[in-house]
Amino acid sequence: MPNLKRLPIPPLQDTLNRYLARVEPLQDERQNRRTRRTVLSAENLDALNTLHERLLEYDARLAESNPESSYIEQFWYDAYLLYDATVVLNVNPYFQLQDDPTIKDTPETAAQGPYGAHTVQVRRAARLTTSILKFIRQIRHGTLRTDTVRGKTPLSMDQYERLFGSSRIPPGPGEPSCHLQTDATSHHVVAMYRGQFYWFDVLDTRNEPIFATPEQLEWNLYSIIMDAESAGSGSAPFGVFTTESRRVWSNIRDYLFHADDCTNWRNLKLIDSALFVVCLDDVAFAADQQDELTRSMLCGTSTINLDPHQHQPPLNVQTGTCLNRWYDKLQLIVTKNGKAGINFEHTGVDGHTVLRLATDIYTDSILSFARGVTKNVVDIFSDDDGKPSSSSLASAAHSANLITIPRKLEWRTDNFLQSSLHFAETRISDLISQYEFVNLDFSNYGASHIKTVFKCSPDAFVQQVFQVAYFALYGRFETVYEPAMTKAFQNGRTEAIRSVTGQSKLFVKSLLDQDASDATKIQLLHDACTAHSQITRECSQGLGQDRHLYALYCLWNQWYKDKLELPPIFRDKSWTTMQNNVLSTSNCGNPCLKSFGFGPVTANGFGIGYIIRDHSVSVVVSSRHRQTARFASLMEKSLLEIDRIFKRQQARAAKPAARTTASANTKSEDMKYLLSGYDYFDVSVSG
């Protein structure tokens, strides 16, 4: 583990200055004057100073009792664990991996493969699972290479300890919140197919993988599929309980705990302690079904079959992938045609940690094919001494008493559980139907073009595009959230980048102003990107405003609410505005990912996961049936329009006298499309 500095607590006045700067672009002059008076009032400063001193004392005690900690850590856990609504679409994000180019998905492949129509699925799942086991081995042996920023600055590695064997457990009787349970001795995985559960051991007592090659694992996965298919559709899909609110799920678990037959409770404990869950989906998605694949990876699909000859209502009517999940844990999802992704419970880990996992297992799964051809292939999971990450087979002495043949988990149901399963299924079906997802794959240019031609930070640039698209559609600016990683500090998590600035507003308005010159638009774009990059740097250094103020609020709420009146800043409308993230965005770029996404965090908002590659930009947009497709289309139009502005400016520089009619007409058509939202919505465009 690297020896890192503690996450700093900024000076209070610096935090307040940043807060005022971040909220100002979202207010009119009257609102901002009121907020400034509130924030700078003696009443507010006295209260916050008291809480700030208590926070410094709390952090000092924490540093002494647990050096590997941070002041925000427990408060951040509580923010997740106190959340009572379903984790589906509200907490869990997903990553979709790129396809495996060494596994061909064709009808001929399926027909000739050893596992029939499931050949591609079984091989992909076996490769990725084997690679994950190597990853776990390195974590437990302490040989996982330290994460760094550009190969230099080391990052905190504490989150990897909670990545596997962890489960979000609903509150027990009398408990105020969920808790994160981690079994550091877990050696088994759970696999699901058609909502049915199986388990088997995958690590020996030395934490060495039992299945050293994918081929050794394939038959286990195929036998699970065959057994589940032979069982028909009568099994109880207990995974749907993890889609319930925490209170409902808690009541069901309590009922199972007190049942005379302890079979169901034993099953729960076995799933809770599993390393992770392998979800083998009985569905394939074609290339033109990317939006539906996104839905399946993030929340599962809802497919209702009302044919009475095939199913007996009310159970077993739902045949979508939403029943083939266990949302309280890390899940590896593999479709029938080999599309693969990861859905993860967010409490203990952030996207950067899971991205490292995704990168390593994707790379290793590809290399495993090459190693079958030649042994002269690098092993990314080799130890520092070059020793391979696992022996060819786990020794018998350390594999004794391990269960390597899949065993099915059988559930006992009664009238209460049958009705609970039914209503859980109808609720998740309702929830899924309320959301829509749109994928934008922009291939005209990417990070390389943005840096060399536009001279902008790619992330800062794309953030401006989101604001342009939203303003073009709705004529206003809303709160935008982007997480900045603070893992350069011990047990760091994230800080909130607030993307709307005075500079970004000027750029957005200029881009939509047909009277503004291209030179002006370019300069304002550079100003906006520079401001965004500066905020990003400060946040990455732990010098933001959101986490500090949130810690102060938590201190007041937990220990001082009976002694101290709530500080005025937390009663001001600006605080509500800043917490209402209409555009919740996150950048998780890596070549191993096909897409990345999550649900909106407000009822009227958008969730925007994006990947900036060298020559393309991929965006997944989610919302509760706002104009999602139109919003994504405006992003694309904005990207194209900005590129045309630079091309026109370059042409003028090369030929100052050239003024072609074609370029003028192109500009007019682009702006007509971007401005179409103003004619459709009766809103002010002066915000």
From Swiss-Prot:
Keywords from the named record: Acyltransferase, Fatty acid metabolism, Lipid metabolism, Membrane, Mitochondrion, Mitochondrion inner membrane, Phosphoprotein, Transferase, Transport
KW Cytoplasm (keyword) present: no
Matches recorded under PROSITE patterns: ACYLTRANSF_C_1, ACYLTRANSF_C_2
EC identifiers of the protein: 2.3.1.7
Subcellular location: Mitochondrion inner membrane
Record PTM Phosphoserine, positions in chain: 517
Cellular component, GO annotation: mitochondrial inner membrane; mitochondrion
Chief location category: mitochondrion
UniProt binding sites for CoA: 446-459
InterPro entries: Carn_acyl_trans (IPR000542), CAT-like_dom_sf (IPR023213), Cho/carn_acyl_trans (IPR039551), Cho/carn_acyl_trans_2 (IPR042231)
Molecular function via GO: carnitine O-acetyltransferase activity; carnitine O-palmitoyltransferase activity
Catalytic activity: (R)-carnitine + acetyl-CoA = O-acetyl-(R)-carnitine + CoA
Cross-referenced Pfam families: Carn_acyltransf
Active-site residues (renumbered): 346 (proton acceptor)
Binding site for (R)-carnitine: 481, 494
UniProt membrane topology term: Peripheral membrane protein
Induction remarks: By ethanol and by acetate. Repressed by glucose, and to a lesser extent, by galactose. Derepressed by glycerol.
Example of a GO biological process term: fatty acid metabolic process
Function according to Swiss-Prot or TrEMBL: Involved in the transfer of acetyl-CoA into mitochondria. May also be involved in the metabolism of acetate and of ethanol.
Protein family per UniProt: Belongs to the carnitine/choline acetyltransferase family.
Protein name stated in the entry: Putative mitochondrial carnitine O-acetyltransferase
Organism listed in the record: Saccharomyces cerevisiae (strain ATCC 204508 / S288c) (Baker's yeast)
